[in-house]
């Protein structure tokens, strides 16, 4: 029988754990140049970087964000979001 590795590879975790209901904004440097940015308008709206948006749902490495504007909810990688302060 093979023994489990004594030194498991650590998994990458975001610096701040984002949970449902958190107020967030998009980190500009993480977002620009990403796949999500290239699939969207070339000039993203400023309100996503200013915040706050509410994190409605978390699935895997993505979160659904609702902005306090009459716009559709969006799915973004959690690594592109930061806590609004």
UniProtKB/Swiss-Prot annotation:
InterPro entries in the cross-refs: NdhO
Protein location: Cellular thylakoid membrane
Domain of life: Bacteria
Pfam families: NdhO
Annotated EC: 7.1.1.-
One Gene Ontology cellular component annotation held by this UniProt entry: plasma membrane-derived thylakoid membrane
Swiss-Prot/TrEMBL catalytic activity: a plastoquinone + NADH + (n+1) H(+)(in) = a plastoquinol + NAD(+) + n H(+)(out); a plastoquinone + NADPH + (n+1) H(+)(in) = a plastoquinol + NADP(+) + n H(+)(out)
UniProtKB keywords: Membrane, NAD, NADP, Plastoquinone, Quinone, Thylakoid, Translocase, Transport
Record function comment: NDH-1 shuttles electrons from an unknown electron donor, via FMN and iron-sulfur (Fe-S) centers, to quinones in the respiratory and/or the photosynthetic chain. The immediate electron acceptor for the enzyme in this species is believed to be plastoquinone. Couples the redox reaction to proton translocation, and thus conserves the redox energy in a proton gradient. Cyanobacterial NDH-1 also plays a role in inorganic carbon-concentration.
Quaternary data: NDH-1 can be composed of about 15 different subunits; different subcomplexes with different compositions have been identified which probably have different functions.
Family the entry assigns: Belongs to the complex I NdhO subunit family.
Protein name (record): NAD(P)H-quinone oxidoreductase subunit O
Organism in which the protein naturally occurs: Synechococcus sp. (strain CC9311)
């Amino acid at each position: 029988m093979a023994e489990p590795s004594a030194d498991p590879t650590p998994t990458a975790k975001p610096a701040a754990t984002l949970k449902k209901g958190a107020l967030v904004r998009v980190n500009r440097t993480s977002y620009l140049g990403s796949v999500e940015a290239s699939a969207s308008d070339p000039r993203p709206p400023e309100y996503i970087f200013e915040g706050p948006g509410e994190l409605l749902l978390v699935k895997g490495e993505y979160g659904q964000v609702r902005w306090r504007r009459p716009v559709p909810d969006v799915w973004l990688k959690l690594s592109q979001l930061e806590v609004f302060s």
